[in-house]
From Swiss-Prot:
Localization per Swiss-Prot or TrEMBL: Cytoplasm
Organism (species): Pyrobaculum calidifontis (strain DSM 21063 / JCM 11548 / VA1)
Any one GO BP annotation for this protein: proteasomal protein catabolic process
Gene: psmB1
InterPro entries: Ntn_hydrolases_N, Pept_T1A_Psome_bsu_arc, Pept_T1A_subB, Proteasome_bsu_CS, Proteasome_sua/b, Proteasome_suB-type
Catalysed conversion reaction: Cleavage of peptide bonds with very broad specificity
Identification of the protein by name: Proteasome subunit beta 1
Amino acid sequence: MTTTVGIVAKDGVVLATDKRVTAGYYIAHKAGEKIWKIDDHVAATMSGGVADLQSVLSFLSLRAREYRVEHKRPIPIRALVNYVSLLLFYSRPYIYLVHSIVGGVDAEEGPVLYMVDWLGTVTKEKYIATGSGSPYAKGALEVAYREDLTIDEAVELAIRAVKAAIRNDPGSGEGIDVVTITKSDGFRRVFTTQQKIIIPE
């Protein structure tokens, strides 16, 4: 149970998550990180089983590093998404219980966002929410999303979306993590102090 959000802005991609880690209805951790840097130009959020998440993320990070060494350039995001799709598809019947949002900026597609489900299905999205809080987050996204959002506007929208989930979903809570990925700055975390101002304790 969690909430993860991805948004494509005109100048980059925003990924946001809550910080609560649950095991059923038990709150296992209150400061979990659910956004992972794969390379300077791409990151992923995942919801699902922690052991499966760690395994899939290690494969993704390794593949990105291998590609950079072999080709002397960053891996195209679509290639990385195809890799995780095949990994999940061919793991059947012993599936990885993960639901992924992969987003970033590359030379081929610019700002781009993909969703990969636990069976390996890939969809390209302008905005997406996953996890138990996704119905509440999607409502906020659908009301306010525009294709001409700046990165700062997309950050504000992502925070509103996760905040809506935290208010209504018992599986989401404890604060918000936000990451931006742009061509100029690459992977960058939004500071915790900003999160505390937006979500007072």
